[in-house]
Amino acid sequence: MIRAYEQNPQHFIEDLEKVRVEQLTGHGSSVLEELVQLVKDKNIDISIKYDPRKDSEVFANRVITDDIELLKKILAYFLPEDAILKGGHYDNQLQNGIKRVKEFLESSPNTQWELRAFMAVIHFSLTADRIDDDILKVIVDSMNHHGDARSKLREELAELTAELKIYSVIQAEINKHLSSGGTINIHDKSINLMDKNLYGYTDEEIFKASAEYKILEKMPQTTIQEGETEKKIVSIKNFLESEKKRTGALGNLKDSYSYNKDNNELSHFATTCSDKSRPLNDLVSQKTTQLSDITSRFNSAIEALNRFIQKYDSVMQRLLDDTSGK
């Protein structure tokens, strides 16, 4: 997404430099190269200059027309695509706008332009904008912004929730041994955290596509002996000691913890695991609230778009009915 030049020309230029000309609306315009050449022939300099009255961030002044590729991007950013129907209303409107831009560039005595001023002068001539285009652009931009943010939040929340689920499996195993007053081995006699059944999965392929599996496959493994065969597992200790998770590594772990009413190291271990996962639980709650908010905004943008299209269609239909009735 390219930030508006009106708010911060430096950010506008930075964003333009990150994209290819082919990604901009007017890259295929039949007059793009002609306009670039006209700016060069008239020795027009377009620059960005820090204005303390408008700009919140200080940036270095820069003549951007020294870079022909950047000049082409600036023009392609606002230049519309050629009309598909030649000679139609849109094509005539577009050609008249381009004609006005050419006349302006050829006749203006001023060859030194600040980017904001240059864009302000040519924008409404160069584009065939209508008010409905502007409204649609604002709504669609809002949808895209909130849609992207929602997708990123969903991915992050899925990862956080998966890690929290693994902690809940560990906590359940600890609680089982607390209830029985026994000893939990978290190393070579540990439950295998790679067991899909622990997370409610019955299909191996579905489990391998899950967020839990994506976390666990990054963990170190422990080799255990099952009869005459060796097997690799992700033990509780492997998981807790690993830095390859959001909550980081938990150090100074023993291989096993026993219940003892006088010095209950198993209870202390349970508390340690709970304390380790508590910030993660808080973060999941925070991200869930953010996702709910951003989803609401996204849905509002869709609703606004639907209402606008319905209203636009209704107005156009009435105009057509009035015209056909005359």
UniProtKB/Swiss-Prot annotation:
Keyword terms of this UniProt record: Plasmid, Secreted, Virulence
Coiled coil: none
Matching InterPro entries: LowCa_resp_V_Ag, Vir_assoc_V_ag_sf
Pfam families in the record: LcrV
Signal peptide as annotated in the record: none
GO terms under cellular component: extracellular region
KW Zinc-finger (keyword) present: no
Subcellular location(s) per record: Secreted
Role this protein plays: Involved in calcium regulation of yop expression, which includes the export process.
Record's protein name: Virulence-associated V antigen
Source species of the chain: Yersinia pseudotuberculosis serotype I (strain IP32953)
